């Protein structure tokens, strides 16, 4: 039995917020702000976006390690946040997230048609998220009401490690019956999500405009001038540079062209780990 390179993609493994649903990735961001506020600690939207892509407990821990936020917490409680304090914030975050997730549950405009086309071309659609399963179940339910059902879903608490570790992406490979990680493309709007795909040995596509990095609504994105959009693209490309995505595109609606290019490269014998 001999090894041979895959010659075409078999699966796209997609993030959720900022990738397929919730243009601008507002659902988790706003709730982080509200959860900290319930402890009389101010966190801005921009600060809350910083660690996006991680599991939510890790996200809160990372925010609490930011010196400015830790100092605000110390002024209220007389100490910097411990892991138990992080858990207290997380336990307030969770019910708020479940309660308000529907507010930001709309599909990315055009995403459903794009994914339908990819499936017609033979791709399986896996997915994973920084949300825990109790939130993910609600996200999946709301997406199904809007016509989107992934072939597999992996929440951050269903594997030993969340992003940027590769476990969630690899859990999709196993569940979907994919025979080679190089036959998968991981699509995400965050650096931890791209690192997840890289470490899993997959092709990676970073989304520049639909997610956390740009942080605008669909209407805000559409209102940008050509000069503003180009400036934001340059800023966000630099943000992703260290995670080395194979491709950067504005939204998931450009993914079919990327898939076609990856298939061309695979047919030539190119592999994602080599680039």
From Swiss-Prot:
InterPro entries registered for this protein in UniProt: HAD-like_hydrolase_sf, HAD-like_sf, HAD-SF_hydro_IA, HAD_sf, PGP-like_dom2, Phosphonoacetald_hydro
MF terms (GO), sorted A to Z: magnesium ion binding; phosphoglycolate phosphatase activity; phosphonoacetaldehyde hydrolase activity
Binding site for Mg(2+): 15, 17, 189
UniProt EC number: 3.11.1.1
Entry similarity comment: Belongs to the HAD-like hydrolase superfamily. PhnX family.
NCBIfam families: HAD-SF-IA-v3, phosphonatase
Subunit field text: Homodimer.
HAMAP family: PhnX
Protein name in the entry: Phosphonoacetaldehyde hydrolase
Organism of derivation: Pseudomonas putida (strain W619)
Gene: phnX
